[in-house]
Amino acid sequence: MAEQAGAGSAQDNRGGRGRRDDRGGRGRDGGDKSNYIERVVSINRVSKVVKGGRRFSFTALVIVGDGKGMVGVGYGKAKEVPAAIAKGVEEARKNFFRVPLIGSTITHPVQGEAAAGVVMLRPASPGTGVIAGGAARAVLECAGVHDILAKSLGSDNAINVVHATVAALKLLQRPEEVAARRGLPIEDVAPAGMLKARRESEALAAAAAREGSA
């Protein structure tokens, strides 16, 4: 009987520790995790030669975005994979930037370069989808781009492709910015189809906001 009681108390203690860990995990991630899209693009094991031998660690390239125009890239390094991913997520959130969108696509064609990576992005009509490779697709989906044509013209290395895609997105400009710089009406610098798509997307967003507040 004593052994059974001891075993039962040990199980209770283990269960208690597990519950405390679960609560800690929820408290650590909180609601932030549910509000963002996270994509792990690559995980690599690296080694460092020291006096006593080799020390191994892991690196993780992570993309984080809200699916509504905000996206960031992070690179984490740690002795364990989960810790490396967590560091990558934290860095990605610090590197957030806004991507100008017209409806579900980008504002104009653009090409970005980073190291040996070269990525070309072109707007696409609704229903086209994200036509892109794995690394570029992760960035575009996290940014909230649903219709786009992307092509890698340089290195196929995932890190280079990701940074080239980010460089291309950072080159995007809103029609208002171009019109103000040239001193022209917005109708003279943006196609009528683009302006129509933007009005429709703004109307849909306003309708969704009204339904949410009702």
From Swiss-Prot:
Annotated GO CC locations: small ribosomal subunit
Disulfide feature: none
Domain S5 DRBM: 36-99
One MF annotation (Gene Ontology) recorded for this entry: rRNA binding
Xref: Gene3D superfamilies: 3.30.160.20, 3.30.230.10
Sorted UniProt keywords: Ribonucleoprotein, Ribosomal protein, RNA-binding, rRNA-binding
Region (Disordered): 1-34
One Pfam family linked to the record: Ribosomal_S5
UniProt similarity note: Belongs to the universal ribosomal protein uS5 family.
Subunit structure: Part of the 30S ribosomal subunit. Contacts proteins S4 and S8.
Domain notes: The N-terminal domain interacts with the head of the 30S subunit; the C-terminal domain interacts with the body and contacts protein S4. The interaction surface between S4 and S5 is involved in control of translational fidelity.
Described purpose of this protein according to its UniProt entry: With S4 and S12 plays an important role in translational accuracy. Located at the back of the 30S subunit body where it stabilizes the conformation of the head with respect to the body.
Record-given protein name: Small ribosomal subunit protein uS5
Species for this entry: Mycolicibacterium smegmatis (strain ATCC 700084 / mc(2)155)
